[in-house]
Amino acid sequence: LQKDGFEADDVIGTLAHQADEMGILTYMLTPDKDYGQLIADNVKMYKPRHGGGYDIIGKEEVQQKYGIATPAQIIDLLALMGDSADNFPGCPGVGEKTAVKLINQFGSVANLLESTDQLKGKMKEKVMNATEDIKLSYFLATIRQDVPISLDLEAMKCKEPDAETLAKLFDELEFKTLTNKFLGKAEKT
């Protein structure tokens, strides 16, 4: 699945949102915490654990793990604390605990930035100095859910692969083991 001009995250976010609205239970397999913002009644995260296994994360797990009111606040959390894996700068000197405290106090990054007069001392200075980085991080952390693409359930049904097309692709990519495993032969086409 792809849509020209859009990131894969945004396509996944849009399709997960559409599936949720249709009442279809959907799992997103990813270790990326920014996908937590997409979790909804019918959308869960299937997160690989270090060392093996998986955790299934729903709304309650996000709220408990991060101490926030809604999964959508993952965006606010990342905007403040940053994310080195995804290159979100955040607000220097603000870690997860402080970010959660600020989100719970102000409700959102937007409210925080409108209410910096309520901050004191070093925290006020940190937020004021990092306003643009916080806004950029918020933008970067937000996974779009409005990509012009439709959830086509018929197209997503599992079908037997076209052996000839698959053989050509595996040959082009030099996937000899997969050719043998899925096509039962190691010969080239």
Kindly label every feature range from the protein language model.
Residues 129, 139-189:
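Low-complexity, acidic/Ser/Thr- and charged residue-rich accessory regions of DNA metabolism proteins
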Residues 1-150:
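Extended two-metal-dependent nuclease catalytic cores across DNA- and RNA-processing enzymes
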